[in-house]
Amino acid sequence: MVELKVVVSDPKTGRAYNVDASTGAAGAVVGKKIGDEVDAGPLGLAGYKILITGGSDQTGTPARKSLPGAGRRKLLLAEGVGFHPVMEGERKRKMIRAHQITPEFVQVNARVTAYGEKTLDELFPKVEGAEKKEKTKERKVRK
């Protein structure tokens, strides 16, 4: 059973929305590649088209567009997705997932390329009580 979390970003507003895709809905994304445009109707976004921009598997291994295939490989990386060097010229061998979306993926990142009739705010209403709580630290004061 394939369960994916599809994170859909709206470039107009800058907001991101989470879509939980179970077996049937995940079929719209599984088998596609990073950079493919997909109809988002099966994900509950009627009329929308999304562009797959990335993702990661259950171990947190990121997917890289430049790596063809469907598996995981160790690559010597100097920059880009999966590695951010600290020093100039630094390289490191890192585990990277290939660009084809498989059932091992847990999260798929996408952005909207074509909009439907309803806005994303209408499709994903705000949940009451989901506001960010202000973090306050109680200080111990000596008396």
From Swiss-Prot:
Pfam families in the record: Ribosomal_S6e
Database matches in PANTHER family: 40S RIBOSOMAL PROTEIN S6
Official protein name in the record: Small ribosomal subunit protein eS6
Origin: domain of life: Archaea
GO biological processes: translation
HAMAP family per record: Ribosomal_eS6
Upper classification of the organism: Archaea, Methanobacteriati, Methanobacteriota, Stenosarchaea group, Methanomicrobia
Keyword list, A-Z: Ribonucleoprotein, Ribosomal protein
GO cellular component terms, semicolon-separated: ribonucleoprotein complex; ribosome
The family this protein is said to belong to: Belongs to the eukaryotic ribosomal protein eS6 family.
Organism: Methanoregula boonei (strain DSM 21154 / JCM 14090 / 6A8)
Keyword Lipid biosynthesis: no
Molecular functions (GO terms): structural constituent of ribosome
Keyword match Ribonucleoprotein: yes
